[in-house]
């Protein structure tokens, strides 16, 4: 039996000033990493370090207006973040209650940040 898989991805070439080269690792794919990619790019083009030296993990799709969308598998992604000693886990608004439930259920020592828009997440990270 032969099985063939295909993945379709919409590519966009966006010109920025300053220029940003962004390389994706082979094991990184899917819409659920969109928010973290956007935050990483923001961190590269500004002088303010959003991480403040901490490990920040998270998930969430993002549209071209900066609105963060829900994802699947929050409990697994949160558990992975805790395992990697992340201090912060960013999660879409639609998944926020589930993340809080999992944090309490497993007594995770991690800050959960609710993500509705890219702008608001940036402001929350700056304020922490």
Please provide the spans of the model-predicted regions.
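C-terminal recognition in membrane/secretory proteostasis and scaffolding
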Residues: 1-58, 63-75, 79-128
């Amino acid at each position: 039996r032969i099985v063939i898989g295909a993945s379709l991805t919409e590519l966009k070439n966006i010109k920025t000033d300053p220029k940003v080269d962004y390389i994706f690792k082979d094991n990184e794919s899917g819409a659920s990493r969109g928010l973290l990619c956007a935050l990483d790019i923001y961190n590269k083009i500004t002088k303010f370090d959003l991480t403040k030296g901490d490990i920040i993990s998270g998930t969430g799709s993002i549209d071209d207006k900066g609105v963060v969308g829900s994802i699947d598998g929050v409990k697994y992604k949160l558990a992975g973040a805790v395992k990697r000693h992340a201090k912060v886990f960013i999660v879409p608004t639609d998944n926020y209650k589930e993340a809080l439930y999992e944090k309490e259920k497993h007594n995770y020592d991690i800050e959960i940040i609710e993500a509705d828009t890219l702008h608001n997440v940036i402001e929350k990270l700056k304020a922490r």
